[in-house]
């Protein structure tokens, strides 16, 4: 029996036209943030990309094909799930999970990768390159490349390859070449550096699929637009479940910030008083006072990285301070320019969550709901429980569960065993 006969409304994945937002301005800026800080050789490529994107998002054929693939290949719409036992544990507001972990490839990254790969093919490019930290963007890029018949090279820090060996094999199985990066801290920032270097060299036939809302214009806007399907679905699904389209608060983890912007942006420009609290959880690592963290808003200063002005973790001489996070996907020393604008304008809050709190959040959701979240998402879960506890039962918190935790199980096992060994040693010393 069709959904039409059952009287169920069809939830279109992409609107008839991609949502338009007030920012960026014509120079690609969000207030003082964003812009294009790149070599002259890249300006024509960025202009070409911007023109191609503007044309594509007005093209019904492009939108219909993206809509079809998001439905039939990715599996959208995914669930807006009431976490009843987690809600009961918190003892306050209802906690809903936006289940990006249900997407094919296991995270929100595929929303953007599939769209950019379609754009690459439309532009006549034959090869895509990508950077990856946790490996999810790399897997999604390799998946989109395999689907559309494009070659794919993924740059990944050597340290992240160790932490995410399963995703490395997935990329290789999909036909991608994974190139290890050993420079710097051998993590996401360094992988991005190498990907940009290759793009500069091979810009004629190569398309760079940037995975987050960072980089030079038009990347932050383009990635936001492709990820905004998350927030647009929440509006429709919450209306069906609760009779209202706007929750009281939305919580999402933030590294560069693509999953967070995807759920924030459709709500961020609502008038004050109608806008929900938007809360991004940054990776506080061992604590923001230790220097071992990746909390760019809490600790950073304005600077330029990867072609964009943003809050950065830099020292008095302007040098990048190596970030740290238990999660490879949050291990980035900056945050996207639109998030910086939200913070300055008071449109969103950004709070630090430590490694230990994220591990607790992961175990809590796993044991109460049977859902193993990605370590990145666990930062948001941890804070959402604290937040819900302070709210009223009739209020609603939506958490963007940005990805599943399969990729992290080996690392979590190692960390928990390490913690247990330390506790045992401490008990023996006390004894």
From Swiss-Prot:
<comment type="subunit">
    <text>Tetramer of two alpha and two beta chains.</text>
</comment>
<dbReference type="InterPro" id="IPR023026">
    <property type="entry name" value="Trp_synth_beta/beta-like"/>
</dbReference>
<keyword id="KW-0663">Pyridoxal phosphate</keyword>
<keyword id="KW-0057">Aromatic amino acid biosynthesis</keyword>
<dbReference type="InterPro" id="IPR006653">
    <property type="entry name" value="Trp_synth_b_CS"/>
</dbReference>
<keyword id="KW-0456">Lyase</keyword>
<dbReference type="InterPro" id="IPR001926">
    <property type="entry name" value="TrpB-like_PALP"/>
</dbReference>
<dbReference type="InterPro" id="IPR006654">
    <property type="entry name" value="Trp_synth_beta"/>
</dbReference>
<dbReference type="GO" id="GO:0004834">
    <property type="term" value="F:tryptophan synthase activity"/>
</dbReference>
<comment type="function">
    <text>The beta subunit is responsible for the synthesis of L-tryptophan from indole and L-serine.</text>
</comment>
<dbReference type="Pfam" id="PF00291">
    <property type="entry name" value="PALP"/>
</dbReference>
<keyword id="KW-0028">Amino-acid biosynthesis</keyword>
<protein>
    <recommendedName>
        <fullName>Tryptophan synthase beta chain</fullName>
        <ecNumber>4.2.1.20</ecNumber>
    </recommendedName>
</protein>
<dbReference type="GO" id="GO:0000162">
    <property type="term" value="P:L-tryptophan biosynthetic process"/>
</dbReference>
<dbReference type="InterPro" id="IPR036052">
    <property type="entry name" value="TrpB-like_PALP_sf"/>
</dbReference>
<keyword id="KW-0822">Tryptophan biosynthesis</keyword>
<comment type="pathway">
    <text>Amino-acid biosynthesis; L-tryptophan biosynthesis; L-tryptophan from chorismate: step 5/5.</text>
</comment>
<comment type="similarity">
    <text>Belongs to the TrpB family.</text>
</comment>
<dbReference type="GO" id="GO:0005737">
    <property type="term" value="C:cytoplasm"/>
</dbReference>
<feature type="modified residue" description="N6-(pyridoxal phosphate)lysine">
    <location>
        <position position="109"/>
    </location>
</feature>
